[in-house]
Curated annotation (Swiss-Prot):
Keywords: Ribonucleoprotein, Ribosomal protein, RNA-binding, rRNA-binding
Protein name (record): Small ribosomal subunit protein bS18
Domain of life of the source: Bacteria
Record flagged with keyword rRNA-binding: yes
Lineage: Bacteria, Pseudomonadati, Pseudomonadota, Gammaproteobacteria, Alteromonadales
Biological process annotations from GO: translation
Function according to Swiss-Prot or TrEMBL: Binds as a heterodimer with protein bS6 to the central domain of the 16S rRNA, where it helps stabilize the platform of the 30S subunit.
Family statement drawn from the similarity comment of this UniProt entry: Belongs to the bacterial ribosomal protein bS18 family.
Assembly description: Part of the 30S ribosomal subunit. Forms a tight heterodimer with protein bS6.
Length: 75
């Protein structure tokens, strides 16, 4: 029986050497929220704790300034 191996998750921000996550960078932030608008946890994305906190703060700021929606499930 073949064994499947799970690819190791890595923090994209650490590998790229990002100093701080900017709340105005909507393209990057959209990769870390679900279709319904929830913030994706670090155990799924592999983001380190330092950058997960910055990411959450940036997403919340962008939501407050109406750059990102709180939810996309409006009907």
């Amino acid at each position: 029986m073949a064994r499947y191996f799970r690819r190791r998750k890595f923090c994209r921000f650490t590998s790229e050497g990002v100093a701080e996550i900017d709340y105005k960078d909507i393209v990057t932030l959209k990769n870390y929220i679900t279709e319904s608008g929830k913030i994706v946890p670090s155990r799924i994305t592999g983001t380190s704790a330092k950058y997960q906190r910055q990411l959450a703060r940036a997403i919340k700021r962008a939501r407050y300034l109406s750059l990102l929606p709180y939810t996309d499930l409006h009907q």
